[in-house]
Amino acid sequence: VFVALILAIAIGQSEAGWLKKIGKKIERVGQHTRDATIQGLGIAQQAANVAATARG
């Protein structure tokens, strides 16, 4: 992040806007990945509960 910031300042404002757009895209992908992981964990937990109930 620090290196990208230095590059943005060195290259100029137009390039900084470009870097910001890429940063937003990466951030959005990260959020989707996090949400999918949380959902996956929830489903895995439910499956484990069902298996435990079936065994018990």
Swiss-Prot record:
Keywords noted in UniProt: Amidation, Antibiotic, Antimicrobial, Immunity, Innate immunity, Secreted
Keyword Secreted listed: yes
Localization terms from the record: Secreted
Organism: Drosophila yakuba (Fruit fly)
GO biological process: antibacterial humoral response; defense response to Gram-negative bacterium; defense response to Gram-positive bacterium; innate immune response
Gene this chain is encoded by: CecA2
Protein known as: Cecropin-A2
Record family assignment: Belongs to the cecropin family.
Function: Cecropins have lytic and antibacterial activity against several Gram-positive and Gram-negative bacteria.
Pfam families membership: Cecropin
Origin: domain of life: Eukaryota
In-chain residues carrying the UniProt-annotated modification Arginine amide: R55
PROSITE patterns (UniProt xref): CECROPIN
PANTHER family: CECROPIN-A1-RELATED
